């Protein structure tokens, strides 16, 4: 059975930095990681620019659309950018990997879109999988994961401990 870690985080916790640092550290240590991590950069898209980085390649995909000053509370997710990132992740999942990481199970995934197919592909391949899950989407995540996940707090110690339990399985 595939091991799935759901990193549950609130609005005051930076899961993006946690997953990015974790993925980069593993990749530097020689672990084959197929994943997308979110890198929040400067101000070209309202307050922050949202980019997904394909782990290992450094390739980035802008997933933020500037909707103008009158859309402060609107969803700024760019479906075309997300689709391009999803395609790159799907291609990465076709290569040998020891771990898959998906930056977020958010609104798009809760509605059945976004990176749902790529999450499914990682599970189908039997890869250990880490997914960031905002607290506001835990109910949708629970319905999606069907109890097959380990819920983790948003901490490096929790991720390190979970990964240490997966290493023998990942090496097989």
Q: Where are the language model's segments positioned?
A:
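Short, solvent-exposed loop/turn segments at secondary-structure junctions
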Residues: 14, 108-111
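Short Gly/Thr/Asp-enriched flexible loops that form oxyanion-binding sites at enzyme active sites
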Residues: 110-120
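Substrate-engagement module of ASCE P-loop NTPases
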Residues: 119-135
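Glycine-rich, charge-decorated loop segments at or immediately adjacent to ligand/cofactor-binding or catalytic sites
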Residues: 135-149
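Glycine-rich P-loop/Walker A and Walker A-like loops and their local beta1-loop-alpha1 context
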Residues: 1-33
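Helix-adjacent hinge/juxtasegments
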Residues: 55-95
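A charged, well-structured terminal subsegment
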Residues: 153-172
């Amino acid at each position: 059975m595939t091991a799935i870690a759901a990193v549950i985080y609130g609005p005051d916790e930076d899961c993006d930095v946690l997953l990015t640092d974790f993925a980069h550290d593993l990749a530097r240590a020689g672990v084959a990681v197929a994943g997308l991590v979110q890198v929040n950069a400067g101000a070209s898209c309202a307050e922050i620019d949202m980019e997904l980085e394909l782990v290992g390649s450094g390739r980035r995909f802008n997933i933020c659309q500037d909707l103008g000053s009158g859309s402060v509370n609107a969803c700024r997710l760019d479906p075309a950018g997300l689709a391009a990132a999803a395609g790159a992740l799907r291609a990465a999942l076709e290569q040998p990997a020891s771990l898959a990481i998906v930056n977020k199970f958010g609104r798009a995934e809760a509605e059945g879109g976004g990176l749902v197919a790529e999450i499914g592909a990682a599970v189908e391949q039997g890869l250990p999988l880490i997914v960031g899950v905002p607290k506001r989407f835990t109910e949708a995540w629970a319905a999606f994961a069907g109890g097959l996940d380990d819920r983790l707090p948003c901490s490096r110690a929790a991720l390190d401990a979970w990964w240490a339990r997966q290493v023998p399985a990942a090496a097989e």
